[in-house]
Amino acid sequence: PDNIMVVGGHLDSWDLADGSHDDGAGVVQSMEALHIFKRLGYKPKNTIRVVLFMNEENGGRGGKKYAELAKTNNENHIFALESDSGGFSPRGFSIEADDANFQRISSWKNLFEPYLIHSFVKGGAGADINPLSSGKIVKAGLKPDSQRYFDYHHTQTDTFDKVNERELKLGAAAMTALTYLIDKYGLE
């Protein structure tokens, strides 16, 4: 399909640790979203692409280069979703969109609320997807529970053993659900 939906996170981290929350979690969640679609046998209407960005921590050159290549190749990105706030329980999404698309996405909030995913707010979606600006692209960032994030963020404790597998999977499921809804029902 001609329209592209991006799901991604960044590969690089600070050298104090392996960067499991920042941003190994986002990388795993993004890949898991495609894995979930494949396991379900879902055939998307749009191209769903996982992008693992590089150099987010030191200039964002991976996101800038991806946007440059998308423009050069005349790719039509309609949606981009980034996970870069740790692998904790998902609590919502920050959404960069015009009013009509923000309202459309917010109308699905009731589908997420039983899982304590309740915060759908206008705001920045993420450093890696920020450079994408083709057409009326809608951008979103997964917002997990942030209570413990700065215990690990850019520290020597940001290691694999600090990531809760269940919370990581819940984040991947939330990303998959939002991507599915946009793919199936479209944007304004």
Residue ranges and their predicted role:
Residues 13-104, 128:
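Acidic/histidine-rich catalytic neighborhood of metal-dependent amide-processing enzymes
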Residues 11, 54, 144-146:
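A mature extracytoplasmic/lumenal domain signature
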Residues 1-12:
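Acidic/His- and Gly-rich active-site-bordering loop/insert found
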Residues 88-188:
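Active-site-adjacent substrate-binding region
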Residues 5-7, 51, 79-81, 138-142:
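Hydrophobic/aromatic beta-strand patches that form the interior of the parallel beta-sheet core
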